[in-house]
Amino acid sequence: MTTYREVSAAEYRIQADEKLEAAVRRIAHEQVEQAIAQLRGIDTHNAQGSIHQCRKHIKKLRGLLRMVRPSMGRAYRPANNTFRDAARLLSPYRDAHALLATFDDAIAADPEGVPAGGLGVAWRELVRRADDSTRSVTGGSAEVQRALELLEHGAEGIDGWKLKGSGWNA
């Protein structure tokens, strides 16, 4: 049985018989399509995982762009900025959940260090923010819609990417 990790890693490889420019485009399309699928599939049960996976695909895509940056010329900056902006729109959601998880981990690591009055007010506020964030992204938030638009716009430009040079010099 092939695991997701094995499939994911295989997709991010340049095949021996593939031209570099074609491989870069293929990999970019795969990553952006997977990022879009994660956002389109968001619901209250998978919101945190979907945002995380979407941002991971964007990170891989931007890493790919950085690898070929010298060969992309002026096409690099607008492509990178488009995908960067899409990920940035999703970061407040990630931040709200990461802050709550970090708070919970810190309390679990040292329960004796919790003040006598407790930290219930702070914890409830963090839970409220995380819950509000989940409702926002699953309710068709403007940020998620804009991130989808940016990803789709970025995907449209991939086939126009030209790499200067040849082979590993590209």
Stretch-by-stretch model annotation:
Residues T2-A170:
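Cationic, histidine-enriched alpha-helical/coil surfaces that engage anionic ligands
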